[in-house]
Amino acid sequence: MRRSKAYGERYLASVQGSAPSPGKKLRGFYFAKLYYEAKEYDLAKKYVCTYLSVQERDPRAHRFLGLLYELEENTEKAVECYRRSLELNPPQKDLVLKIAELLCKNDVTDGRAKYWVERAAKLFPGSPAIYKLKEHLLDCEGEDGWNKLFDWIQSELYVRPDDVHMNIRLVELYRSNKRLKDAVARCHEAERNIALRSSLEWNSCVVQTLKEYLESLQCLESDKSDWRATNTDLLLAYANLMLLTLSTRDVQESRELLESFDSALQSAKSSLGGNDELSATFLEMKGHFYMHAGSLLLKMGQHGNNVQWQALSELAALCYVIAFQVPRPKIKLIKGEAGQNLLEMMACDRLSQSGHMLLNLSRGKQDFLKEVVETFANKSGQSVLYNALFSSQSSKDTSFLGSDDIGNIDVQEPELEDLARYDVGAIQAHNGSLQHLTWLGLQWNSLPALPGIRKWLKQLFHHLPQETSRLETNAPESICILDLEVFLLGVVYTSHLQLKEKCNSHHSSYQPLCLPLPVCKRLCTERQKSWWDAVCTLIHRKAVPGNSAELRLVVQHEINTLRAQEKHGLQPALLVHWAKCLQKMGRGLNSSYDQQEYIGRSVHYWKKVLPLLKIIKKNSIPEPIDPLFKHFHSVDIQASEIVEYEEDAHITFAILDAVHGNIEDAVTAFESIKSVVSYWNLALIFHRKAEDIENDAVFPEEQEECKNYLRKTRDYLIKIIDDSDSNLSVVKKLPVPLESVKEMLKSVMQELEDYSEGGPLYKNGSLRNADSEIKHSTPSPTKYSLSPSKSYKYSPKTPPRWAEDQNSLRKMICQEVKAITKLNSSKSASRHRWPTENYGPDSVPDGYQGSQTFHGAPLTVATTGPSVYYSQSPAYNSQYLLRPAANVTPTKGSSNTEFKSTKEGFSIAVSADGFKFGISEPGNQEKKSEKPLENDTGFQAQDISGQKNGRGVIFGQTSSTFTFADVAKSTSGEGFQFGKKDPNFKGFSGAGEKLFSSQCGKMANKANTSGDFEKDDDACKTEDSDDIHFEPVVQMPEKVELVTGEEGEKVLYSQGVKLFRFDAEISQWKERGLGNLKILKNEVNGKPRMLMRRDQVLKVCANHWITTTMNLKPLSGSDRAWMWLASDFSDGDAKLERLAAQFKTPELAEEFKQKFEECQRLLLDIPLQTPHKLVDTGRAAKLIQRAEEMKSGLKDFKTFLTNDQTKVTEEENKGSGTGAAGASDTTIKPNPENTGPTLEWDNYDLREDALDDNVSSSSVHDSPLASSPVRKNIFRFDESTTGFNFSFKSALSLSKSPAKLNQSGTSVGTDEESDVTQEEERDGQYFEPVVPLPDLVEVSSGEENEQVVFSHMAELYRYDKDVGQWKERGIGDIKILQNYDNKQVRIVMRRDQVLKLCANHRITPDMSLQNMKGTERVWVWTACDFADGERKVEHLAVRFKLQDVADSFKKIFDEAKTAQEKDSLITPHVSRSSTPRESPCGKIAVAVLEETTRERTDVIQGDDVADAASEVEVSSTSETTTKAVVSPPKFVFGSESVKRIFSSEKSNPFAFGNSSATGSLFGFSFNAPLKSNDSETSSVAQSGSESKVEPKKCELSKNSDIEQSSDSKVKNLSASFPMEESSINYTFKTPEKEPPLWHAEFTKEELVQKLSSTTKSADQLNGLLRETEATSAVLMEQIKLLKSEIRRLERNQEESAANVEHLKNVLLQFIFLKPGSERESLLPVINTMLQLSPEEKGKLAAVAQGLQETSIPKKK
């Protein structure tokens, strides 16, 4: 409150008495403020000066003192105080503006004023105050200043064209300097600016300027065209100004402006003539004048007291009638924004508003408009209207309103269809204003039809999708048309309820519920308007720089509410309203895709409503404080209405099932609901089924099925009529009028009569053949099609979206048909006509597009069938129940012609049961007449196959040529037709003999009894008349069903969550993915498991069983997350993981916990499949010990491979060997055309039961792709005291039978605990591919002719100049590549996984790498990059993980520039650190083995190396060329140990697979040149006969100490070489020491021979090294399999622990349950788990029945 002087003095006296002297001065600032409030400025100034004497640097005191000086008008001192305060506290921007204003007032010529104004302009750009100051300064400079002011305004307008004040000031400058033409020109330029057109000040300025221009002498002296154009602009400006004045000003100002508008119309009326722009504009402005007059009358009633609403509403109705009957302009001369006709938009707006107001005023009043016209459409009524609008002082005769002729108007009520069309045009005129959209929605809210909100939004947002797949997100990018439509429905709904509440309190019967748009108050809240404006700004990308982030937050905040996510705070009644409106709108749409989206969103809201309905039963829903949509208690859902709403929800769910094609589910759901709506839907479904069967009904069983469906349809229709008779209220629930139901019943009864004997569908006691008269696919126009207006309209269903854009193709087909018709003009008159219909002489109503079937579009059919164009039956108006997207629409006639091309859009008749290509069902074939019969009309199809099924069409049994000539001759009985009957249509007889011919290849005639389709790629080949033919690059395989592994499981729970896993290494949670967490129950064994896949990529991120030992624990700090411990298989192998799932709400988290515990309870009722023993035998420890022994053996094997002094001697093996692998031989089949080895592996099963199996095996040469049964086990372990023996064996049975394998001496393990028989626990199973892959197509990356000089993983960035920061471009391998031909070097980088280019440019001499500041691992350079396909200068930066890699990149980069200049190749980075190697092939295997045996290389240190000798059986064939099929080898751990592999004893050879020939090493053979008698090498020639190779011995020595292992047998895969003799000895012998080459003299022939021999030996040695390399890789694979076996054993132990827990729970249940059936139900589980004897089972059964007591020990 304001203080008085007395109060200040009292307070001052009290303080001065108690405070010391310095304290008094410090409190002076406060005293000064007290005196300032008391307006004692002198005392205030005194005390503030006292305060400043002790506190001189206080900016507040200086500012306060400046204010006091300003009040005294002491400008100089005030400026000085303000300046000092600004120095002490610079952020005070307002002081800069204050100083500039004071200086401009004091002395404009002072230079300081200009300085401070410029300084303020930088701080406040675009401020009107700055503009006034600058204008004041420039005005004082005279003409020069005026020019500067003009230039400055022009420059400012260039930056801010929407600035209203600047535009007005510029026009005023023109007017003040008498430059009226320039002022008018400026008004013309600004007319396109929407911001200016919506400004009242700007429109007032335009009207004044145009009026001055018209009154000026200059204008009168100019030509008449200029005057007429200016008059046109003036009338348009008046209309716009009138609209804005009605919205923002009072009644008096609106009256004055309307009178001025009247004068302008009267002035222009005298100059009318002709059909020019002025005449058209005048006529349109006349309509706007009367419309605004009616709005002004209602505004008078809104603001007046004691208003006679009846009189005002009648006069307003007269004005609206006149405005509505003014015709729309016929010329388009004035072009507005985006090419839209300005007059056209204004006319649509006028007709829309006037029409709606007429319906609004006449609602509930019969003949209201007729009475108004009769009463006031005359001279007396015109006088009453004039007096009501204008003052009595003005002359009536000189006004437009008083002299206009209104006596010839008619009573014309607006049609709803016309209003809907006008509304769409008016939307554009108002630029998507939310006030206008809400007003239109309110008008339609009281009409029987739904508002066309979808069309309005499509008009405003052309490219916005209709629905989003990401309903759970709130990202602004996911916004769609349905979101905006729901928003508008909500705004209209709440506005309507608010208006209704106001009208109930005080409302006259003549007062309209909703006033005209310019007059009515704001219909939406500020929060709703701000959200709508933010959405429009973001979608149209008109956001001010720096403001888009704020707009995104505004949009994002409300999307959750619109989608009813999380805590939406919506009233349940609004959710119900949304669900019902969306369902009703979706039902009236033509496209099945639109129906799915609308009804799907309706289902989404119903699912949100149902939980709220349960809460309503208990208590009411709390109302939020500031909701987006206000709650109205008048529409709160009552408990008595809950059942009805639940029923509506389930009906909507069933409708969605029908739309998606799940007809059976929909029928089941509808049958469970007893209401007329479900009866109606069931009647439609069954009638559609009957119609589908009727199309192809040939056999009696089909006829009977059709009759059954018709009977069901009849029964449901009768139920509807009966319920309606007993309760009239149910009629309102029907989606169609009751008359339509009766009409449909009558038609169904007629169809049932037709099926009776003697009916028109019968001929000679049986159903008429298709040759005779049948129903055409075009139904009667009176049949059943739903429309939103609840009346039957005949409108065929539109094709899917992907086919809706083929208008050009359809036009082309029409042109072809016209051309064919012209060719047929010389033929005789066609006998084709429409077949006789059973519908009677019903006429086709207007709007029925009979030619729609001719332009049929491809519909969605079964995924395994080919794409064919189908005719959509127009029997129903795309009713959601009648034609789901997954089914095919049949026509009412069987199809006779095979269509080959899908591009031509022809329709084909197909039953709903699908297609059968090239096959037929036995017993359903009927031979047809080969002679073509007469056709009635149009275009029909002829069955080429000659076979027809009752449910489908069989294609491709014979070959034929399809032409239009055949079409013209096709029969009427089996065909279908296009379009409606045209008496002038001559048909296609004899036309197009060779046009569009198709040649069909032969197909197999035999039926496939197994039910599989036999495909033939050459079944149909099209001969294109334009010689344009495209071969597919890759032949796509046959479509197969997608297998996810979840087929045999039932989904018990599914919810979207965010999954985390705990990383123990860094001790923190890591996000694993977003997706749906499912709990699946196996239908076979009943086990539940948890599965989760990531969204979009569908990668498994959780996959584990649910066990009884798992516990859910809440995550600390959150009530929406649970964590648990599980053995997870998401990465393929079992891994113990700590997982956590975060849910959206605590309710969802609690629901998950309940479902989880329910699954654990289910586990108690599941008996174990395989009881496991609970004794730990230490088997895992033994396995680990054997693995260590194997590593030790591999170390010796590595030493053997690296021996560079290998010598081979020729010795005979006299023993035939009966060891582990002695009975298993290797077959070698030489091939003259194949120089590589042809390998064949024996089958070696690893279990006794597999050895006894009688599955026969075949040679790989007989069946290269033959598959073998999947083995039940891979590993067998046996205990041994001497070591172990391992051999490579194939999983495929290729050449040996299991009977042979039984003769082998291989030791097979017999440990009981190793015999695991559960199929799901096998490792290494083999699966046949589900989809056969096409031939491999070479992928060209563009890097083929380039060497990789540098390659390393890095992160690439580019500099964005617009935002001034670095942006990440991708992570991947950055490469430096050099072209082999031109030596050019470039940098290429692709992103990981997606392989998208993110860098691609040449390295030029002027490029240089520079370090980024702050790090030495980042290099920066500038280049002309082509990563996006176009040349673009980019500033790039690459970051490496290690410093040495970054340095290497810099080094190679610099070398690349030098190499380009010298035209030389660069040494690749990867090979620089490598040293020259003698044997480049074998070292890789050594490195792998070295890594494997690194831990135990110190165990064996001797120099002994095992020698190997083996025996081989060679069988040669000379004709067939074969390919080897090698299956993955397996390990067999038998009864022998390391001694049998690497020992020097002869009795323990190295058994490694099959017996091997001399020259075969470790199972891979190499053949040395044959030894002749003189010990010289000779070549090997081919022999056509089979030959046995005798076993030989192979010796390997080191440092001349040769230890032989004569009995060592090796199973070998031998290379196929040509043979010359039937028995050949393969030997390698160490050559005797020869003198060096330079000590001996040789002839030329000897040198050539030795060179040839050396070359062959080197080639063979390289082959050996390559094979050893492959061997080492196989060994690594076996070690991997061993580890997998160990992991499997660990899993068994985990499951055993779970079994113990399960047994404990079962026994506890048994003990505490009462004797009887409950106990007996647990007996099988206990018997199985404990493996009780018969005697023990009997005792337990007695206990269960209560015959014997059991004692429970009690604790003491």
From Swiss-Prot:
<protein>
    <recommendedName>
        <fullName>RANBP2-like and GRIP domain-containing protein 2</fullName>
    </recommendedName>
</protein>
<dbReference type="InterPro" id="IPR032023">
    <property type="entry name" value="GCC2_Rab_bind"/>
</dbReference>
<dbReference type="GO" id="GO:0005643">
    <property type="term" value="C:nuclear pore"/>
</dbReference>
<dbReference type="GO" id="GO:0006607">
    <property type="term" value="P:NLS-bearing protein import into nucleus"/>
</dbReference>
<dbReference type="InterPro" id="IPR000237">
    <property type="entry name" value="GRIP_dom"/>
</dbReference>
<keyword id="KW-0597">Phosphoprotein</keyword>
<feature type="repeat" description="TPR 2">
    <location>
        <begin position="583"/>
        <end position="616"/>
    </location>
</feature>
<feature type="compositionally biased region" description="Polar residues">
    <location>
        <begin position="1228"/>
        <end position="1237"/>
    </location>
</feature>
<dbReference type="Pfam" id="PF01465">
    <property type="entry name" value="GRIP"/>
</dbReference>
<feature type="compositionally biased region" description="Acidic residues">
    <location>
        <begin position="1310"/>
        <end position="1322"/>
    </location>
</feature>
<dbReference type="Pfam" id="PF16704">
    <property type="entry name" value="Rab_bind"/>
</dbReference>
<feature type="repeat" description="TPR 1">
    <location>
        <begin position="59"/>
        <end position="92"/>
    </location>
</feature>
<feature type="region of interest" description="Disordered">
    <location>
        <begin position="1573"/>
        <end position="1614"/>
    </location>
</feature>
<feature type="domain" description="GRIP">
    <location>
        <begin position="1693"/>
        <end position="1743"/>
    </location>
</feature>
<keyword id="KW-0677">Repeat</keyword>
<feature type="modified residue" description="Phosphoserine">
    <location>
        <position position="21"/>
    </location>
</feature>
<dbReference type="InterPro" id="IPR045255">
    <property type="entry name" value="RanBP1-like"/>
</dbReference>
<feature type="region of interest" description="Disordered">
    <location>
        <begin position="1206"/>
        <end position="1241"/>
    </location>
</feature>
<feature type="domain" description="RanBD1 2">
    <location>
        <begin position="1326"/>
        <end position="1462"/>
    </location>
</feature>
<feature type="compositionally biased region" description="Low complexity">
    <location>
        <begin position="777"/>
        <end position="796"/>
    </location>
</feature>
<feature type="region of interest" description="Disordered">
    <location>
        <begin position="759"/>
        <end position="804"/>
    </location>
</feature>
<feature type="region of interest" description="Disordered">
    <location>
        <begin position="1299"/>
        <end position="1324"/>
    </location>
</feature>
<keyword id="KW-0802">TPR repeat</keyword>
<dbReference type="InterPro" id="IPR013105">
    <property type="entry name" value="TPR_2"/>
</dbReference>
<dbReference type="InterPro" id="IPR000156">
    <property type="entry name" value="Ran_bind_dom"/>
</dbReference>
<dbReference type="Pfam" id="PF07719">
    <property type="entry name" value="TPR_2"/>
</dbReference>
<feature type="compositionally biased region" description="Basic and acidic residues">
    <location>
        <begin position="1587"/>
        <end position="1610"/>
    </location>
</feature>
<dbReference type="Pfam" id="PF00638">
    <property type="entry name" value="Ran_BP1"/>
</dbReference>
<dbReference type="GO" id="GO:0005737">
    <property type="term" value="C:cytoplasm"/>
</dbReference>
<feature type="compositionally biased region" description="Polar residues">
    <location>
        <begin position="1573"/>
        <end position="1586"/>
    </location>
</feature>
<dbReference type="InterPro" id="IPR011993">
    <property type="entry name" value="PH-like_dom_sf"/>
</dbReference>
<dbReference type="InterPro" id="IPR011990">
    <property type="entry name" value="TPR-like_helical_dom_sf"/>
</dbReference>
<dbReference type="InterPro" id="IPR019734">
    <property type="entry name" value="TPR_rpt"/>
</dbReference>
<feature type="domain" description="RanBD1 1">
    <location>
        <begin position="1029"/>
        <end position="1165"/>
    </location>
</feature>
<feature type="repeat" description="TPR 3">
    <location>
        <begin position="647"/>
        <end position="680"/>
    </location>
</feature>
